[in-house]
Amino acid sequence: MSEQLWFLFALAGAGIGAVVQIIDMYLRQDEVFSHPIEPTIVSGTMQAMLWLSLPFVGFEYPSSGLVAGLAVIGGVLHIASLFFYFKVVFSFGDMSVISMLWNLLVAAVPILAFVLLGERLDALEYFGILLLFVGALALSFAEGVDTGLLPAVSKYMLVAVFLMGLSMVCLKGVYEHSTYWSGYLFYNFGIVGGGIAGYVFFLPKRYRRRFHGTFRSLFLFFLGIEFLQLAGEFCSNLATSLGPVSLVSAVESLQPVFIVFIAAGLFFIGKLFPWRRIRVLQPMCREQFQGMRVKMVAMALMAFGVYLIQHI
């Protein structure tokens, strides 16, 4: 049963992540933020919403200080990865290039898990991961990749991918020696602490007044986004605690597939209802119809990859 549960939670995490990524695209196009550290701060500090659950589920300490420290480090690595991701989004804005490079996480996590955790999968599972990786790359290329941006974008995205992969492997190591709740709670402490550190040490003073005003005026909007983000992380982390982290990251590579369907839905909604905030996303949504034949083949490959990693 746990084999099915980790898959379902990983799938839910990918779906929620797709919604959050589309909202991130909207925020970039609407120029809500002025500096890439600003969405990093919001993403980090508002994860403190999890602490509201403490009166109901209680506080639980990991099995040792070493495990607790590893969980916190994993959270810090997570928020650091998001900073480099947002830096690329704000500096270049070409989501096809960014998505293509982010898909390297599918390859990075199995390597890191093999080296650091000794995680071993069978041949069919590795082949399934390969198909998901190839399919995810094909989805990115179907939208047209500006290869001229690759040298400039790669140096930041490779750092983001490495940090996120290391974060996931750290979390899996924590779950091998602790309960889900204690590991996730201290991982969350690292994320929130990283967000606070981003504000204190990395947000230039000339941006702070505008950031404060933006945060106040859009607080409820941010609250909704980060609640979704928290729900996605909850599902992803629960999947990691139940199944191999390599397979969890592979299933989460289905996020571009969810983006295709969600963006297509938003496109048709925008045609039916003249809502300005929906119409802002129309150009991005329209891009999802480019290279549809290639995308169909890519999604078929990914579906077969999912079948292979679920063969047991």
Located regions from the model:
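Polytopic alpha-helical membrane proteins, predominantly small-molecule transporters/carriers
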Residues: 1-312
